[in-house]
From Swiss-Prot:
Identification of the protein by name: Ribosomal RNA small subunit methyltransferase G
Pfam families: GidB
Family from the record: Belongs to the methyltransferase superfamily. RNA methyltransferase RsmG family.
Origin superkingdom: Bacteria
């Protein structure tokens, strides 16, 4: 492949360890392969704003590794139903699934080219229990079992997302947000904080919040 991006596995291992994670061989290969594919197709599809695999790791992929650790602290079923709404180019989803493979994880993406890229990435490095749905979330949610976990990076403003998914959560279901800010002091009525985590990156501090309905809506 002309102009193929090559990710140094040695350097990637070093970056993972610096962030506090010891990558397994399978996890390392999945993340490296994803970065190579992402940066190659980024030239024509404008998938992400970064231009080198190193910058992409430090600004985007590292969030997925921290997210995997955060999800392990949450009270989830052994095999949760997980929705990644507005999955885009697969961040956080694909690196997350390289590190955290519980349950059934569906990346929902309405844009055809991005959904095509997600399928291409999974065809190159299959990840257990990981799927792509091309279409609008409104069409996806009624067709699935209720979600134990919804993940959102920038699908829609957080208050709107809570309203959007509230009728589709399983008992004990949670919505996890990736944010640059701490969880707001005031939440919509009927919602509570399950957990919050601050973590550091080369780009500064970032947050995860997990919110849950106090009473699951009917």
């Amino acid at each position: 492949m002309a102009g193929r991006v090559e990710v140094s596995r040695k350097e990637l291992t070093k970056f993972c360890r610096e962030a506090g994670f010891e990558p397994s061989p399978g996890m390392l290969e999945a993340i490296a392969g994803y970065l190579e594919l992402l940066l190659h197709w980024n030239r024509s599809m404008n998938l992400v704003g970064t231009r080198t695999w190193q910058d992409t790791f430090h600004t985007l992929v590292v969030d997925s590794l921290h997210l995997a650790a955060f999800l392990d602290t949450l009270p989830l079923p052994p095999e949760p139903e997980v929705w990644d709404l507005g999955a885009g180019a697969g961040l956080p989803g694909i690196p997350l699934r390289a590190a955290w493979q519980r349950g059934n994880y569906t990346m929902v993406e309405a844009r055809e080219k991005r959904a095509m890229f997600l399928r291409m990435a999974l065809a190159r490095h299959p990840l257990p229990g990981t799927n792509v749905f091309q279409g609008r979330a409104e069409a996806f949610m009624p067709s699935r079992p209720p979600a134990d976990l919804v993940v959102s990076r920038a699908f829609m403003p957080w208050r709107e997302l809570l309203d959007f998914v509230s009728g589709h959560l399983a008992p004990g279901g949670q919505v996890v947000f990736l944010s640059l800010d701490p969880v707001p002091a005031s939440l919509p009525e009927g919602w509570a904080v399950e957990a919050e985590s601050l973590y550091g990156t080369r780009c500064g501090g970032r947050y995860f919040w997990s919110l849950r309905p106090i009473i699951v809506p009917n």
